[in-house]
Amino acid sequence: MAEQDVENDLLDYDEEEEPQAPQESTPAPPKKDIKGSYVSIHSSGFRDFLLKPELLRAIVDCGFEHPSEVQHECIPQAILGMDVLCQAKSGMGKTAVFVLATLQQIEPVNGQVTVLVMCHTRELAFQISKEYERFSKYMPSVKVSVFFGGLSIKKDEEVLKKNCPHVVVGTPGRILALVRNRSFSLKNVKHFVLDECDKMLEQLDMRRDVQEIFRLTPHEKQCMMFSATLSKDIRPVCRKFMQDPMEVFVDDETKLTLHGLQQYYVKLKDSEKNRKLFDLLDVLEFNQVIIFVKSVQRCMALAQLLVEQNFPAIAIHRGMAQEERLSRYQQFKDFQRRILVATNLFGRGMDIERVNIVFNYDMPEDSDTYLHRVARAGRFGTKGLAITFVSDENDAKILNDVQDRFEVNVAELPEEIDISTYIEQSR
């Protein structure tokens, strides 16, 4: 595993297996072929925010027409430099809020990093950096870099020295390593962003790193934090980083269900899961599918089995070298493979626009993880299907917790499902 060769100071935190809560959705805006597919309740357009013309051009290229509710609530204040604490359900465009707000305010100065965005997994950091590249398409003077463990720190040092970015996205372990070896100066940071902030601040080792990095940035700066799940306990921790923040809780925590997502369970023995999965993959219509399992071993074995059964599957898990993970993520995102088998590593924040079915082959360990996993389907308010295998009493208990917490009824999978309920007919 590539991470293990790397010095201690390149700590990453995405290596827990079961306990990794899936990450909400950091949405990549829809591509042109699914134009305007955000659920939007506002008829105002992005022009009303008085954004730079370069940003508006990029927004049009991405196929956005109207801001989502969270964008409508946050962007006008965020572009004025106000601190923001935001919770909104998966797939509602939170990433675009901080990407647009920081690019609107940025005044690039050679050799100075002014925007720092941190998240808890490498894949999510990679994805956010791609969003910055997408939205800064017509801002050629703005340079964006992404830094995370598992790849050579020497390359990162070289980038900072010879082609210093204005926007840095990364994981706290690698960022702190670069700061400690004096490759990376935080003294010009004007915008400090945490995506999936609950995940970062709940883990004490990661929270310590975030706090150390935060203390090394200037006192006067904008601080923004976002997540799909923000418990009452973690909110005060977030507020300690902020000065009089605007707080936007678009959804009451109990109503974090996803519009357009059909959710079902199947009761079966562990030994019956493979046969049932193959049967369902045969009869269901899908664009792309993600199958979540609880361990690296199961991930590898199931992916192999699917390939042997002529299902074009690819696996992503924490045991892979970083380059391999990113390469596979890109293959799946580019639609080269239609079935992905993954551990929780992939659950939170990853955004693949064509996924319309998620299987919980193994039950997630809690209701947060359930939300973040199933949020991979039905992105941007499109239709989707989530099917959860329940094989013992503990599984049943977690499913009951999900139904109680999110006030949703997860029914037993019927013999037949109307295809129009889980797939966009126009696609």
Curated annotation (Swiss-Prot):
GO CC annotation: cytoplasm; membrane; nuclear speck; nucleoplasm; nucleus
Induction remark: Up-regulated in proliferating cells. Present at low levels in quiescent cells.
GO biological process, one term: mRNA export from nucleus
Annotated crosslink Glycyl lysine isopeptide (Lys-Gly) (interchain with G-Cter in SUMO2) location: K31, K35, K154, K162, K240, K255
Segments forming domain Helicase C-terminal: 260-421
Domain Helicase ATP-binding: start-end pairs: 75-248
InterPro entries registered for this protein in UniProt: DEAD/DEAH_box_helicase_dom (IPR011545), Helicase_ATP-bd (IPR014001), Helicase_C-like (IPR001650), P-loop_NTPase (IPR027417), RNA_helicase_DEAD_Q_motif (IPR014014)
Keyword Zinc among UniProt keywords: no
Tissues with expression: Detected in testis, and at lower levels in brain, kidney, lung, thymus, spleen and salivary gland.
Extent of Acidic residues compositional bias: 1-19
Any one GO molecular function term: ATP binding
Annotated region (Disordered), positions in chain: 1-34
Catalytic activity: ATP + H2O = ADP + phosphate + H(+)
Main localization category: nucleus
Modified residues (N6-acetyllysine): K35
The keyword Cytoplasm is assigned to this record: yes
List of residues that carry Phosphothreonine: T171
PROSITE patterns named among the record's database cross-references: HELICASE_ATP_BIND_1, HELICASE_CTER, Q_MOTIF
Sequence motif Q motif, location on chain: 44-72
Pfam families, per the entry: DEAD, Helicase_C
UniProtKB keywords: Acetylation, ATP-binding, Cytoplasm, Helicase, Hydrolase, Isopeptide bond, mRNA processing, mRNA splicing, Nucleotide-binding, Nucleus, Phosphoprotein, RNA-binding, Ubl conjugation
Binding residue positions for ATP: A88, K89, S90, G91, M92, G93, K94, T95
Function: Helicase that plays an essential role in mRNA export and is involved in multiple steps in RNA metabolism including alternative splicing. Regulates nuclear mRNA export to the cytoplasm through association with ECD. Also involved in spliceosomal uridine-rich small nuclear RNA (U snRNA) export by stimulating the RNA binding of adapter PHAX. Plays a role in the negative regulation of type I IFN production by increasing the nuclear retention of antiviral transcripts and thus reducing their protein expression.
The protein's assembly and partners: Binds ALYREF/THOC4 and DDX39B/BAT1. Interacts with the apo-AREX complex component SARNP. Interacts with MX1. Interacts with MCM3AP isoform GANP. Interacts with ECD. Interacts with PHAX; this interaction stimulates PHAX RNA binding activity.
Similarity comment: Belongs to the DEAD box helicase family. DECD subfamily.
UniProt name for this protein: ATP-dependent RNA helicase DDX39A
Origin species: Homo sapiens (Human)
Upper classification of the organism: Eukaryota, Metazoa, Chordata, Craniata, Vertebrata
Gene designation per UniProt: DDX39A
